[in-house]
Amino acid sequence: MEPRVITYTKNVFLPLTSVCRNRCGYCSFRTPVQEGCVMLPEEVEAVLAQGQAAGCTEALFTFGEHPEEEEGFRAYLEKTGYDTILDYCEAMCRLALRYGILPHTNAGILTYDEMKRLRPTNASMGLMLETTARIPAHQGSKGKEPEVRLAMMEDAGRLKIPFTTGLLLGIGETAAGREDSLIAIRDIHKKYGHIQEIILQNFCPKNNTPMAAFRVPDTQEICNTILMARRILPEEISIQVAPNLIDASRLIGCGVSDLGGISPVTIDYVNPEHPWPAFNDLKKIVGDATLQERLCIYPRFIRPGWYDPGLQPLINRLNQRISRGSSQP
């Protein structure tokens, strides 16, 4: 019997802005329009330089959804020298490529044309489905309408973009709702074959949010959801948990196959109170399994060419580099 392989990526986290049109009850990432709400180009470049020196292969670009809808945001965006957040994101993705790091953008709801525009500079993209249920946590958050998120996932499939999605567990959904969400992901993947992985992320309450006192799902509940996902989803879709948010060592046996992006350079800006595990601790987390670094584009998508031809030299070079290296970080 072959040993199990647990994968991870080495990344830098680049939150281009914390301004967002949504008002999710569990989120502390979103901030008002204020000084420092936009990451400036020189700040992005400094992080990319550190990431290059640390051997990072992924630049995770995130920003609040449709920040231009928030009054006063454009005045701060102008300081970057770009007219729209999409212009800025595209330019910073190109900058990441010049540093030899593959971009992965997760920016909330994007249209078909917006994703098509970003595709040449992104090895993969993502959007958390979170849930197909309508829940109080998403009141005032039009970007969290399930139909809108599912439609974007379909558009990504039509564009042949390797895609990451997932569920946020413990925000008011039920076990039946989780099953419905997993089935929806499975059905979209059956049509397009583009889902690389799903993240099963446990809710972590944040101070000074409406859901600060919500119950946190326990490890057994997360394990049951992982088992459900493994039963519903095709084997080629990896199941990821975040090792800074939960004791991943207790979930490896439930069917987890990936630990996601872990950074030697940047914090988890969405969950800043939860530091990444040290790279030397990852082997302890996976136990008897084999730990293997990967790129943000999974190997099975490299061979068929699910990316812009302009990315091929860098993808091949980075893939060869991590393939030659040890499974140790």
From Swiss-Prot:
Consists of two subunits, CofG and CofH. Catalyzes the radical-mediated synthesis of 7,8-didemethyl-8-hydroxy-5-deazariboflavin from 5-amino-5-(4-hydroxybenzyl)-6-(D-ribitylimino)-5,6-dihydrouracil. This is 7,8-didemethyl-8-hydroxy-5-deazariboflavin synthase. Its EC number is 4.3.1.32. PROSITE patterns: RADICAL_SAM. Belongs to the radical SAM superfamily. CofG family. InterPro entries: Aldolase_TIM, CofG_family, Elp3/MiaA/NifB-like_rSAM, F420, rSAM. Keywords: 4Fe-4S, Iron, Iron-sulfur, Lyase, Metal-binding, S-adenosyl-L-methionine. [4Fe-4S] cluster binds at residues 20, 24, 27. The keyword 4Fe-4S applies. Binds 1 [4Fe-4S] cluster. The cluster is coordinated with 3 cysteines and an exchangeable S-adenosyl-L-methionine. Its cofactor is [4Fe-4S] cluster. CDD domains: Radical_SAM. One of its GO terms (molecular function) is 4 iron, 4 sulfur cluster binding. SMART domains: Elp3. Pathway: Cofactor biosynthesis; coenzyme F0 biosynthesis.
